[in-house]
Amino acid sequence: DDEGGLLETIIGFVVLIGIVVVVVWLISSVVKRKKAIKAFYEQANYYREVPNGGEIRVSHFLAQTFDVANEESLLIGALILSMINKGCIDPQTEESVGAFGKSKKSVNLKLIKKPDTDIEKKLYKVLVKAAGEDGILQEKELEKYAYKHPESVSNLLENALDDGREIFAENKGFTGHSGRKISDLTAKGKEELAEVMGLKKYLEDFSLISEREISETIIWQD
């Protein structure tokens, strides 16, 4: 019995050591990955053009995978800006007087025509449903629609991420099938990532985004 108990203790100790080693390795890998991404970001030059040849799904994939942007919903905003510049959506500013005579500005989006790219068509379809019969998307309407139909937006975001990964892989962006580390990227893949990071650096350093009107989206044009 004593020998059996000792054996169980030894086995338990070995298993515990193994678990600790695996946890330490995982933490070390995450830290190394984040350090490599941070170093790559710091070395990226400013980029003022539309990244990745205008393929927003690739930009979305790179931004999400390499910690350039944490909010998936940023893709929705970028697509809406793109459709505004193409004349598919017309932003209309309204000013109303609220309580105590305080004026309030709001921006409504008038849906004009269907866009030409697949991902924009998918979002435009969602916007049409959210806007209702008048074809004008008012503040909070998209938010309310997404709350009632969460799959409509989540599916669009997931499909965009998957498509972006597939397109990036087809364009020889990875050294292998896929990856989440800088070392998993080819020279071409690193160039594509540098464009996304460079645009973010430019916008953060030189653009007061919070002060821009929606009509000032010319920077997103080709």
Features from the language model and the residues they span:
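Acidic, Ser/Thr/Pro-rich intrinsically disordered cytosolic tails and loops
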Residues: 1-222
